[in-house]
Amino acid sequence: NELLYQVHLTAVIDEGAVIGQDTRIWHFCHVCAGAEIGKNCSLGQNVMVAAGAKVGDNVKIQNNVAVYSGVTVEDDVFLGPSCVFTNVSNPRSQVSRQSIYEKTLVRRGVTVGANATIVCGITLGRYAFVAAGAVVTTDITDYGFVVGIPGRLSGHMSRHGHKLIFDKANRAVCPESSLRYEWVGESVRCLDLDEDVPLPENLSVGSRDYRSFEKNLLADE
């Protein structure tokens, strides 16, 4: 039978793995029996998806990432190179905890930067942004921007990955997309789009790189 997804010759796909249409699996990957991967995903070199792990649609997993049992990744997530998940908070070689893996939920649209570590048992809210090298030990709110070791909230990011600058009315505008955001209590929401659906086609291609926007902000100051 013709596969509906693409697999490199060096990748290993166990019988019983579920993989969606148009997903691309590159060199030296291993998708275990019982793993679920959605459609239109990309798995870079040396990615492992374990039994019981779930990956949604349009997820980009960069090189050297292991998605362990107990991890659920929703749609439109970006997992940067060599980022790390765990599924036991107190591992010991002599103590088996395979039946009590702790759950980690990565909500729609999240970005996890290169070499970041996500400690198990937490939820990364929709469109949260984890900076490269951060160590995240607690839940992140929707659109939250987390940096450092241990990870700390350093603001909020738009769906296009730009830091939101809120005015006195707790409103902010993404400098790239012009989408409006509102900060109410401890949560941020987009005023112009349904947050549970993909970006419309006219907003799904970047127009300028992040550094150019950053320079404009500094010039305005």
Give the predicted meaning of each segment.
Residues 2-9, 14-17, 24-123, 150, ...:
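Flexible, glycine/small-residue-enriched loop-and-beta-strand segment within the central core
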Residues 1-10, 22, 71, 76, ...:
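Terminal amphipathic alpha-helical/low-complexity segments used for targeting or macromolecular assembly
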Residues 138-139:
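Loop-to-transmembrane alpha-helix entry segments
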Residues 114, 132-133:
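Active-site-proximal glycine-rich helix-loop-beta segment
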